[in-house]
Every structure is written in C-alpha cells, then in structure tokens.
Design a protein with these regions (language model features):
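Extended acidic/polar, glycine-enriched regions
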Residues: 1-2
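Aromatic-lined carbohydrate-binding/catalytic grooves of carbohydrate-active enzymes
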Residues: 6-168, 181-186, 190-195
C-alpha cells in the first residue's frame, strides 16, 4: 500500500454517518427514516450547533432499497429518498451534495465492498471472476444473513485481479459525486480469510491494499470501521 496524501485533516473534522433507509423486502419497499430533503434540514441544524466547523456526512442506505442492499454495486440511488420536484433520486442526491456545501458540510457515501447478494446484478460476474468466497468444494457459500437474505463474502483477490472492482468503482465515480467529495466510507472492510480455502490472508490483504491504492489514485480518501 502506498503512502497517502489525505484530502482532509480528520482530526479537525467532524465526520459521521446519517442513516437514511433500510429495505423492507417482504413489502418490496424502502423503510425511510430521512429523505434527502430532510437530510439537508439536519445538516443545517448541525452546522448551527457546531458553529460552522468542517463536517463530513456519509449517507447510509442511499442505494437500492436501503442499507445492506445491492452490495457491492454502488449505482442505484434509493428512489424513496427523492424530492418531489426532482426527476430522479440521483438528481436529489446531487442537489443535497451541492446544498450541503453552504453549511460547511461534505456529503459522501457509506459503501460496502465485502458483501454480495444473489439479487445484485453483478453477482454472476462476481462468481465468474472467482470473486466470491467459496467452500472447499468450490461452491459460493453464504456466511451471513442480512435483512432476511443470504449474504456472501467478496474475495478481494478475484475482485481486483479480474478488473471487476475497477469497473464498478469507475461507474460509481461517473454517476455519484464521490470524486468531488474526495472521501468515502467503506463499511466492514474485513478479510474473510478463514472462509476461503483458495486464497491466503496475505493474498486477500495484498488485494485489499491494491483496492485502496486504486481509490486513492482517483483522489478519494477512505475511512472505515
């Protein structure tokens, strides 16, 4: 992993997550806690309370039907968060990004590159690229349950070496203001070493470092848990 030149001094910046929505899969809808319009109201209040200090807010549940949906893809904005006056939720998201600047706040994204679901459009590509953790028989194997669905773990080695990570990340940068934000929060960026008999922890760690280097080459800081 290369030495980084950070875009922000995180020791002098208030940075936090904002939980917008989560899936309600049985009813095929998003359970919304905070819309994009309501998020700006909160940002204004926080700015007043903090006397205008620099802030970064990472949006959680901005994609798909909400938190823990669509991973590891990052291109479908949650339509339930849209402002009525906007054509699409993506338009509303960009509006929030621009408006938040007036209140000393950078809006960015909470994303996940460790988990995958069969309903995610790129899941067949992940399997083909050997980018999903498998069992000893070579079969992709779920290891957790999120929102009532089987959750699979991403093999960073296959994900990066196949070029699929770069493809998904470039698409993310083209559609969302993440380059402009200059920072992103990657959730649960762990290594499923004991679950993957085909790669070592050293292989996965090296691939994760390559992913971090790639994101940094796009001019984006990475924060994580």
């Amino acid at each position: 992993m290369k030495p980084y030149k950070w875009n922000y001094d995180y020791s002098k910046t208030l940075w936090m997550k904002m939980y917008l929505a989560e899936p309600d899969f049985p009813n095929h809808r998003s359970k919304v806690f905070i819309t994009f319009a309501e998020a700006l109201d909160i940002i204004k209040t926080v700015d007043n309370l903090t006397l205008g200090i620099p802030k970064i807010i990472y949006l959680v549940g901005w994609q798909g039907l909400g938190h823990d949906d669509c991973y590891p893809e990052m291109e479908q904005v949650n339509e339930a968060l849209k402002r009525p006056e906007d054509k699409t939720a993506r338009d509303s998201l960009w509006w929030l990004f621009e408006e938040a600047k007036k209140y000393h706040t950078v809006v960015s994204f909470h994303v996940n590159q460790s988990d995958a679901y069969t309903a995610t459009p790129c899941f067949p590509e992940l399997v083909k690229a050997d980018a999903v953790v498998k069992n000893a028989k070579g079969i992709p194997t779920p290891i957790e349950v999120f929102n009532g669905r089987d959750g699979y773990k991403v093999s960073y080695k296959g994900y990066f070496e196949s070029g699929l990570f770069q493809k998904n990340w470039n698409r993310f940068c083209d559609l969302m203001p993440v380059r402009e934000a200059g920072t992103v929060h990657i959730d649960n960026f762990c290594i499923a070493q004991s679950l993957n008999p085909y790669t070592s922890v050293e292989d996965e760690d090296a691939a994760r470092n390559h992913m971090l280097d790639y994101i940094q080459s796009c001019g984006i800081d990475v924060t994580t848990e």
